[in-house]
Structures are given as C-alpha cells and as structure tokens.
Amino acid sequence: MRKGLLVILLLCSIAGMSWNWWPLPMAEPDTTDRDSLIYLAGLSATAGSGRFSASMISENEQGATAITPFSGSLRAAIIKPATRPRRWYDYDGAIDITGMIHSPLDEAIYGNGQGRFPVYRGKQGSVIIRQCYAHVRLYIIDFSAGVMPVSDHMDTPLGTGSLLLSHNAPSMPTLHIGIDRWTPIPGLFGYLEIKGGLTHAWLTDNIAVHNSMLHYKYAGAQLGGRLPVNISYEFHHAAQWGGYDAAGNDLGNDLHSFKNVFLAHSGGHSYNESFNAQGNHLGSQQLALTLQGKGWHIKGYWQNLLEDNFNFIGRGQNLSDGRWGIS
C-alpha cells in the first residue's frame, strides 16, 4: 500500500514539474525583436614541403581547402542564421563561396586526380560552393533546399562528423524535410521527445558512376525531458544509389528503385543488387545518456556502424566496437 502511494506521489510530482501538455519553445514569449545577417570574407594561403598539406587544415571544411602543399584561397559569404526559436516560424540560409588556386598533384603517383581527388582533375584552380541554401521551420517541421553539407544531426562537436557522414565531405545539392530538433510528443508533458528527417541529395564527384544520388533518413527518441537524467536512441540510414556507369547504363533512377533503396530491398540491374539490396547501404546507431542541471549538461554516447543487415544496438556487435564519446 505504501509503495503504491509512493509511486502515485512520484508520478504526480513529475507531472507537476510542468502542466503544459505540449511544452514547445513556441509556447514561450518571443523576446527576440530582430533578425541578423553575418558577412564573412577571408584570404588564406598554405605552404609545405610534403606532397600534401597538413590534414588538420582540411578538417570540417566540406572539401573547400586544397590538399596540395601550396595553395591560396579567397572566401566570401553572407549568412542568415536562425534566431527565433520561440516564433512559430524561423528561417535561415547562406551563400558561401570559396575560390582556390593550388599547386598540381604529383601525376606520376596520383594519376592527375582521376581517382581519389576529382576536384583537382587537370586543374590548378577551383571555385567551390560551400553553401547556397535556404531553410524554413514552420512550427515543428523543417524544410531545406540548396547546396549544403549533409548533416546527420549526431552530437560529435569535437570530431569531423559521425561514423556515417563526414564534415570533410563536399556540400551537395540537397532536399530535406524533417523534425530536426528534439520535439515533445503531445500529451506527455515533454518527457518523451522525438526527431527525424528524410534527405535526398545528388552526388557531384562523378567518379566511375555519374549522377548518382544519396538517400539519407534518421529517427530518434529521447526519454526524460526536464528530468536530471535523459536517455536517447537514434538510428541513421544512408545509401548511395542510381546514376549511370562508365558505359552509360542506367543503374536504377526511377521511383521503383527509390522504393527499393528506401526499404533496403533487393532489385536493380546488377547481379549483387538483385539478391542483396539495391544501392550501397550503411547504417549507424547512437545510444546516449545525458546528465543535466541548470545551465549545464554532460552527455556520454556510443555510436556503431552497420552494413547490410540491421541489428539493434548491443546485438550482433561487440560493445567495444564503435565510437565512445563525451560531450
């Protein structure tokens, strides 16, 4: 009897922390009275003695830095950040372009960039669009379109991306729809939150396979809300698919092929895809535990990588594999 009474009191106290049945940021007053623009311009140069520039120079730059030892670049950008999280709508966007000159690759060793480095293919100068996109949030739904990095929204602030998608990869023409930030489920007082999204992008490197595409989707749930301890789980799925091979053969670019890729079903024209899965598929999961208080939080997480078959986190993988992190 006493245990039952304690459980009831605990549930009442948790609910009493917030009687708002759907505690969205938009429920609070919007105290921001203006938007802002950021103007950016920069000039940089590198010089080195090896065949490549230092790897740290290229980290988190979306492929907009030269890998050769001598280079110079000019960057100009106009950025409109999202500044109104409590308004029922918000928007942001950017135009960010880098012009670059660089020393040639060692053709005897690297084949004039035909393989690993297509941006350097017979050139000593490039213009790279880092970002040219627009994003709109309508209440809880996010829409994005344009040239931008494909982000997997995983929490890796000290690295170059998650195990699945890298911040070193060039930006791509992209369409995206989703719920990009943790959003409470109506009626649960904010103690269960979800997020997820669907992205379609066009790859631009055109090595061996031309005009191929990227399919990416993710979903996550977080339990805890305003409690001192939160636990969250996310699943991310990416697949390269479609395009045309060197002989011009169609590798599957229609809606039926997209359905196979979306569901990771077999199909396509190649022998392997006819009994395996159409497209090249990779998945990743993240399990995270967050401790939080007023003005601070600390998160410990584990990410793993999946290929071909899905296994729930902890099944089919060694716990020591993957990435362990704290943020």
Name each model feature, range by range.
Residues 59-64, 100, 115-120, 159-165, ...:
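Extracellular loop and loop/strand-boundary signature of outer-membrane beta-barrel proteins
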Residues 21-74, 83-97, 194-200:
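Transmembrane beta-strand segments of Gram-negative outer membrane beta-barrel proteins
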Residues 4-13:
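Sec-dependent N-terminal signal peptides
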Residues 65-71, 122-129, 168-172, 210-214, ...:
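Transmembrane beta-barrel outer-membrane domains
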Residues 178-327:
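Signature for the C-terminal beta-barrel architecture of outer-membrane proteins
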Residues 21, 26-39, 80-93, 137-141, ...:
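Short loop/turn motifs that connect adjacent beta-strands in outer-membrane beta-barrel proteins
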Residues 88-136, 151-168:
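Surface-exposed loop and membrane-interface regions of Gram-negative outer-membrane beta-barrel proteins
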Residues 39-54, 91-101, 136, 143-149, ...:
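Transmembrane beta-barrel strands of outer-membrane/channel proteins
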